[in-house]
């Protein structure tokens, strides 16, 4: 469960390290986002010479959450941290590599490029 002011780790090599959610996209009164949802983030921490800079505003898709995700078969999956991947307006990742596992729920949300770059899909 990601909401406004939530800090997330960045799971790609775009140059950002930490981001903060400033808006959950998908409706005027939507307050909560989960895996596969698109949010608007502000870059809070970035590395030198990266593609993005501190203070930039970008879109991101959530790939891992600490709150468990319920699946249709009754199982649940959760992670230690909240993580996101920065994307452009067309929904393509800004970075060229993805770090750490991502969930199968991204497949249903049409983020196949992120799934193909990820080292592990759970």
Curated annotation (Swiss-Prot):
Binds to 23S rRNA. Forms part of two intersubunit bridges in the 70S ribosome. GO terms for molecular function: large ribosomal subunit rRNA binding; structural constituent of ribosome. GO terms for biological process: translation. Part of the 50S ribosomal subunit. Forms a cluster with proteins L3 and L19. In the 70S ribosome, L14 and L19 interact and together make contacts with the 16S rRNA in bridges B5 and B8. HAMAP family: Ribosomal_uL14. Keywords: Ribonucleoprotein, Ribosomal protein, RNA-binding, rRNA-binding. Disulfide bonds: none annotated. PANTHER family: 50S/60S RIBOSOMAL PROTEIN L14/L23, LARGE RIBOSOMAL SUBUNIT PROTEIN UL14M. The keyword Zinc does not apply. It comes from the Bacteria. SUPFAM superfamilies: Ribosomal protein L14 (SSF50193). One of its GO terms (cellular component) is cytosolic large ribosomal subunit. CDD domains: Ribosomal_uL14. This is Large ribosomal subunit protein uL14. The keyword Cytoplasm does not apply. It holds the Pfam family Ribosomal_L14. Belongs to the universal ribosomal protein uL14 family.
